[in-house]
Amino acid sequence: MSGESISTFQFLGLTFNTTNLISGLVSALIVFCVVFALSRNLKLKPTGKQNILEWIVDFTNGILRDSVDEEEEKNFGLYAFTLFLFIFVSNQIGLFLQIAWNDVSYLRSPTADPIVTLTLSLITMMLAHYSGVAKFGFKKYFEKTYLSPFKVWLPIGVFTEFIDFLTLGLRIYGVIFAGEMLLKMIGGIAFSGGIVNMIVAIPLALIWQGFSVFLGSIQAFVFVTLTSVYISHKVEDE
Amino acid sequence: MFSHITVGAAHGSTLYVGDMLFYAILFIVLMALIAKFAWGPVNAMLKERADRISNDIDSAEQSRIEAEKLAKQRKEALDNSHAEATSIINNAKDSGAKERELIIGNAQNEAKSLKDKAKQDIEQERADALKSAQDDIASLSIEIASKVIKKELDENSQKDLIDSYIEGLGDSK
């Protein structure tokens, strides 16, 4: 972000960041188009693209299955599926496509902005807490979350929940932001000097991009895994 | 993160609350669209497949039981037919033996009666032949005698003949 200006605008008294709006919209569109294309012409005996879709569904269901029971798996399956795909695409999109104009980038990884990752994290935490209340009632939920194992644990309980929310969002932001920044720096090296710089920078960029793809996938997986763990903390009866 | 927020603030605003709202709505809309176009159909299809597979397993089990039953039935029928065939053959043998005995008995009787009749016929024939032969011999001898008598009616022989008769007469008394 060093020295880079940001395009914002005000609407209904709220501040919007144009970059995040565009990036998020593009990511969501890509996710939807891919899923829509994969889910056409479903057959009882799966072939080709249907196998891919079923594999992704099975993958995110498998993440849930590790921490919650079967009934909850059905309830949160769609959430985990959408979350995983959206974060995955968001992580990867900035690696191969960044559009900047007048020193303002309009398209990059939306997850390279903490406000986006914290929003996703907040959605997860709200969903988890809501599910806990919906399942056990407020009294038991409160006791289970904040007053266990002892009543004096209350401050630590509150703090833990807040830390969970922060780390969930900031972990992914850190990785993706750092990845993009380094990629930008490598790009800067490539275009700052002569042909020698370019030759040095190309394999560097290649290696770092590959590594970032790996990191982005891992982070999407970790985000969904932690989501399911947090949800299971709230809805599972120990 | 904080520098970022400060940058945001420098532009004359606080946190990008609008972004949070936008992302929350975007995410919900995306989830709804995926639910409608992919998640629902895929899960329905998966459920259908699971049902189909369990049905297939059930029906396979049923078919297996049915096949076993049929095989058992067939085996029983085969055993029955073996027994039946044996009894039929035995019956046929028995009746064949009876028939044979009957035929042989009849044939023997017939042959015996034929033989008896043939014997009788031969006896009759012989008796007839003998009788006719006697007749023939008698007439022949008479003829021969008459011819001999006619030819050799001379004195000497006549005399001898008469003598012998007379002698014969004296002997017979």
From Swiss-Prot, chain A:
The keyword Transport applies. The chain crosses the membrane at residues 18-38, 76-96, 114-134, 150-170, 188-208, 211-231. Keywords: ATP synthesis, Cell membrane, CF(0), Hydrogen ion transport, Ion transport, Membrane, Transmembrane, Transmembrane helix, Transport. One of its GO terms (cellular component) is proton-transporting ATP synthase complex. GO terms for biological process: proton motive force-driven plasma membrane ATP synthesis. The keyword Membrane applies. GO terms for molecular function: proton-transporting ATP synthase activity, rotational mechanism. Belongs to the ATPase A chain family. This is ATP synthase subunit a. The gene is atpB.
